Amino acid sequence: MRFFFLLLTVALFLTSITGDDAERMLGMKEGGYVREDCGSDCMPCGGECCCEPNSCIDGTCHHESSPN
């Protein structure tokens, strides 16, 4: 009987982290944006879309300065 409750607890835990939480844990969803929302050459970064040539470092979009 104890094994059944352990199995039930694990199953409930696994189903509770699916969806948005699992995507956020895997880094696929960040700040409400997913990669599809940002476009092909952009990525979600700290709640905003960070596009090329900028880079996402520690959840912050670092804007590359233009050469001119």
From Swiss-Prot:
Primary location group: secreted
* Cellular compartment(s): Secreted
Annotated Gene Ontology cellular component terms: extracellular region
Q: Which domain of life is it from?
A: Eukaryota
| UniProt family annotation | Belongs to the conotoxin G2 superfamily. 1 family.
Question: What other facts are recorded?
Answer: Negative results: does not show activities on voltage-gated sodium (Nav) and calcium (Cav) channels as well as on nicotinic acetylcholine receptors (nAChRs) (at concentrations up to 100 uM).
UniProt note: domains: The cysteine framework is XXVII (C-C-C-CCC-C-C).
Q: What is this protein called?
A: Conotoxin phi-MiXXVIIA
